[in-house]
């Protein structure tokens, strides 16, 4: 328990915890800024009685990586007090993949198992939707420059995927991404129009997607910048899209950003109807904020957007 609290107290990427932390060994709790976090140990996801801890109708957030299909994730629902499950990864089979701001209204009361898609999908879909709604995308390619993850090896070792076996802190690793196919499930109007690939790089957090798009109509750099800036400030996706024109911004500056993505206005390239967008995202904290937004929707919690009359805006 003390080790878990220590990992929360000091984070190599996100820095020191802002507040107080206390460990209650007797009650198996970590108390963070007065909030009691109960640590529950069990032999399996179906072996917990949440009601013993005063928890009823719980939404279980599964970030174990152990299951991604409905059968595996439904094990949580066998535990007393658990009502619904959300996976922090792409769901397989018939599981609905929900991206806050895009298709959160597809959540129904009888949906017991949902997925929050991937961090990359959450980053690119809001920008693609905004651009497609305004300009109509003819085709495009997305290249993800992704921070390394603990799926990779620290030093060269065996891995089921050849290149990912090489040391993550030492190499740029070309790999694949399922984000392009995931996009078309969320935005069917882009089906067959996008390709995608990925490069894992030796940085611990904050990733970048380069969107190379052909639009149905020509635009200018100034016009596209203003459109994306306005979308970030006042649009339906203002919680998902951020926009920066800082000339010296780099990846580490965006650690802790709460948006699903940040459009780099200074890096936009436009030539007639061909555009290149550089879209940053904190693949840890920014994605976690998106997951929280989905959980809030599942729980029936909603916070207003500004302006107040924006009833149709995203969640």
Language-model segments: residues:
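A generic structural signal for alpha-helix starts
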Residues: 122, 218-219, 286
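N-terminal Rossmann-like NAD(P) cofactor-binding subdomain of oxidoreductases
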Residues: 1-154, 158-165, 269, 293-294, ...
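C-terminal substrate-binding/catalytic lobe of Rossmann-fold NAD(P)-dependent oxidoreductases
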Residues: 1-50, 136-139, 144-275
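A broad, structural surface signal
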Residues: 129, 133, 181, 222, ...
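Acidic active-site catalytic centers that drive phospho-/nucleotidyl reactions
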Residues: 62, 210, 282
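NAD(P)-dependent Rossmann-like dehydrogenase/reductase catalytic/cofactor-binding core
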Residues: 255-315
């Amino acid at each position: 328990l003390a080790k878990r609290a220590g990992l929360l107290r000091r984070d190599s990427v996100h820095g020191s915890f802002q507040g107080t932390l206390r460990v209650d060994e007797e009650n198996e709790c970590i108390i963070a800024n007065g909030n009691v976090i109960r640590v529950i140990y069990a032999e399996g996801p179906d072996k917990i009685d949440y009601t013993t801890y005063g928890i009823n109708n719980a939404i279980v957030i599964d970030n174990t990586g152990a299951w991604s299909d409905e059968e595996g994730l439904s094990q949580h629902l066998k535990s007393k007090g658990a009502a619904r499950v959300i996976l922090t990864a792409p769901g397989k089979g018939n599981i609905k993949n929900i991206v806050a701001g895009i298709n959160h209204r597809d959540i129904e009361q009888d949906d017991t198992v949902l997925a929050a898609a991937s961090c990359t999908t959450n980053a690119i879909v809001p920008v693609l939707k905004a651009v497609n709604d305004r300009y109509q995308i003819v085709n495009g390619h997305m290249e993800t420059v992704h921070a390394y993850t603990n799926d990779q090896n620290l030093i060269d070792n065996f891995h089921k995927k050849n290149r990912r076996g090489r040391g993550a802190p030492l190499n740029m690793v070309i790999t694949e991404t399922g984000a392009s196919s995931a996009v078309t499930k969320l935005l069917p109007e882009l089906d067959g129009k996008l390709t995608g690939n990925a490069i894992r790089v030796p940085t611990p957090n904050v990733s970048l997607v380069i969107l190379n798009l052909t639009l149905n109509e020509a635009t200018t750099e100034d016009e596209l910048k203003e459109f994306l800036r306005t979308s970030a400030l006042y649009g339906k996706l203002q919680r998902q899209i951020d926009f920066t024109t800082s000339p010296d911004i780099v990846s580490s500056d965006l650690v802790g950003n709460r948006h699903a993505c940040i459009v780099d206005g200074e890096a936009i390239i436009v030539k007639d109807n061909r555009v290149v967008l550089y879209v940053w995202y904190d693949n840890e904290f920014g994605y976690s904020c998106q997951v929280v937004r989905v959980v809030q929707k599942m729980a029936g919690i909603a916070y207003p957007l500004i302006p107040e009359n924006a009833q149709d805006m995203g969640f």
